[in-house]
Amino acid sequence: MKKILFVLAAILLLAITVQAKKVKVTIDGRVSPSQTKLYLIINEDTANAQLLPIKDAKFSVTIEVDSKAFVRLHDWKEWPERSAFVLIPDSRHITINWNTGEIEGSELSKKLKKALDEIKQHSPEGFHIDVFSDDPAAWRSAQESGNSMREMMLQEQRMIAKQTILDNRKSFICAWIVYCFPELMKGELEAMLDHMKPKWMNHPILKKKQQKN
């Protein structure tokens, strides 16, 4: 009987240990004067996105969330890759400025924003070579050069994503990077993550994405 009670106590302790810690955080700030909509989405649960009231280009909301949640603020709830702000509740009060992109009160949110900005800066998306000629050969040459340049940029972007993950391997901010840039995770990066088996790969947003796929 004592052995059974001991096992049950151990299971209960484990459940308490792994249970996500809840935190209460106030998020406020300024938005663009013309902005009429602002959604708050927790861990990409867009079905339960919260439409925040805006008054005089300001907003304020207090929420209780998991300490490792990703809180996305945007006027378009279905577009995580282009989010204006992705916040991590590592403090009780976070303030954002929509016009300048500044975040106050959350060092983890700043760290994530910096990592995302660096990866996006090297994106080949939209890159092209202008051709001021009607010569088909010139067009073919430009297309080949453009494809080669885009591939080089993609490889560089992939290397930056890899280094970012290695530098932050124990931080769950990597979960958002993997979520937003799945195309960069193929091949070498995918093999690296399979080998590392980081705990953040069990984050709810990645589990949800795996279920969809």
What role is predicted for each listed range?
Residues 1-2, 20, 162, 170, ...:
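Intrinsically disordered, low-complexity regions
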Residues 20-163:
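A non-transmembrane, solvent-exposed segment enriched in polar/low-complexity residues
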Residues 1-28:
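Bacterial Sec-dependent N-terminal signal peptides
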Residues 166, 173, 177-213:
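Charged, long alpha-helical assembly modules
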Residues 7-10, 14-16, 40, 53-54, ...:
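Generic detector of low-complexity/intrinsically disordered segments
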Residues 132-136, 140, 169-180:
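Amphipathic alpha-helical repeat scaffolds of TPR domains
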Residues 2-5, 16, 114, 201, ...:
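Intrinsic low-complexity, intrinsically disordered segments enriched in polar/basic residues
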